[in-house]
Amino acid sequence: MKRVFLVGYMGAGKTTVGKELAKLAGLSFIDLDYYIEGRYHKAVSQIFAERGEEAFREIERNMLHEVAEFEDVLISTGGGAPCFFDNMEFMNASGTTVYLKVSVEELAKRLELCKHTRPVLKGRSGEELRAFIAESLEKRNPFYTKASITFDAEKMLTESDVHDISNALMKIL
C-alpha cells in the first residue's frame, strides 16, 4: 500500500508530474482540486466565491482525509492545502510527501501564461505578479518544507523534462 502526496505552489507542476509519476509507479492519480469539483459539482473558484476561503479550506481538509483512505494512490494537492489545519502533519503521517520546489522567478513565468484561469492571479502581471508569488511563497514555505522529500522542479519545460523528473522521483520513492 502506497500513498504519495505532491505539495507545492500553484504552477509547480504537481498535476503534470503527478500524472506521469503515478503512471510510472502504477498508482492511481487524484488531483485534490478536481476531486472536490467532482464532489461539489462546482469549480473550486466558484466554491471559494460562494462560501469563502474558510469554508473552502474545511471542504478541502475533509476531502483530503477522504482520499487519504485510498490505497496505492498519488494525490496532487492544491497549493494552499498543506498550509491549513494540520493538513501537512496529516499527510506526513499518512504517506510520503514530496515538495516540488520552484523559484519565484520560474513560477512567475509559468503563471503569467495561465493567470486568466486562476482567480487569485487575475489582474496581476509582471512585477506585481512576482511580488504576490514571493509573498505567498514566503508564508507557505514553512509548511512545504515539512515534506519528507524536497525535489527541484525548476526545469520542466518539455514532456521529456517531466518524464525525467518523474523517473528521478521514482528512484527516491
Curated annotation (Swiss-Prot):
The keyword Kinase applies. Pfam families: SKI (PF01202). Pathway: Metabolic intermediate biosynthesis; chorismate biosynthesis; chorismate from D-erythrose 4-phosphate and phosphoenolpyruvate: step 5/7. Its EC number is 2.7.1.71. Substrate binds at residues 33, 57, 79, 140. Mg(2+) binds at residue 15. It is found in: Cytoplasm. It catalyses: shikimate + ATP = 3-phosphoshikimate + ADP + H(+). The keyword ATP-binding applies. Disulfide bonds: none annotated. GO terms for cellular component: cytosol. ATP binds at residues 11-16, 118. Its cofactor is Mg(2+). GO terms for biological process: amino acid biosynthetic process; aromatic amino acid family biosynthetic process; chorismate biosynthetic process. Keywords: Amino-acid biosynthesis, Aromatic amino acid biosynthesis, ATP-binding, Cytoplasm, Kinase, Magnesium, Metal-binding, Nucleotide-binding, Transferase. Binds 1 Mg(2+) ion per subunit. One of its GO terms (molecular function) is ATP binding. Monomer. Belongs to the shikimate kinase family. Catalyzes the specific phosphorylation of the 3-hydroxyl group of shikimic acid using ATP as a cosubstrate. This is Shikimate kinase. It comes from Parabacteroides distasonis (strain ATCC 8503 / DSM 20701 / CIP 104284 / JCM 5825 / NCTC 11152).
